From Swiss-Prot:
Signal peptide location: none
Any one cellular-component term (Gene Ontology): ribonucleoprotein complex
Assigned keywords, A-Z: Ribonucleoprotein, Ribosomal protein
Name the UniProt record assigns to this protein: Small ribosomal subunit protein uS10
Cysteines engaged in disulfide bonds, as pairs: none
Subunit and interaction comment: Part of the 30S ribosomal subunit.
PANTHER family reported in the protein's UniProt record: 30S RIBOSOMAL PROTEIN S10 FAMILY MEMBER
Function: Involved in the binding of tRNA to the ribosomes.
Pfam families: Ribosomal_S10
MF term (GO), any: tRNA binding
Source organism of the structure: Prochlorococcus marinus (strain MIT 9312)
Family: Belongs to the universal ribosomal protein uS10 family.
Gene: rpsJ
Length: 106
């Protein structure tokens, strides 16, 4: 039974448009895991997704005149090994910025 508890892990995937906000959120999660004596591996940077939008500048003619906009979605991965009940409670109570999307898998 203790072997299955030792093999438990929590995988946290973070997404954000702002890289600095994402890195601060990763630091908070890792500090929380370290204070509850769980081992955290990461943040592992995943590939950044670029989405480019092409828009006509003029509402009427001039199709040659276009404008490009892009959004970049930065992603990070954190694995927390051997989490305790304290670790899970601390992660649930953690206050992270609203611009960061969090996906947790047990």
């Amino acid at each position: 039974m203790t072997a299955s508890i030792a093999q438990q892990k929590i995988r946290i995937r973070l997404k954000a448009f702002d890289r600095r906000m994402l890195d601060l959120s990763c630091e908070k999660i890792i500090q929380t895991a370290d204070t509850t004596s769980a081992s955290a591996i990461g943040p592992i940077p995943l590939p950044t997704k670029r989405k480019i939008y092409c828009v006509l500048r003029s509402p009427h003619v001039d199709k040659d005149s276009r404008e490009h906009f892009e959004t970049r979605t930065h992603r990070r991965l954190i694995d927390i090994y051997s989490p305790s009940a304290k670790t899970i409670d601390a992660l649930m109570k953690l206050d992270l910025p609203s611009g960061v999307d969090i996906e947790v898998k047990l």
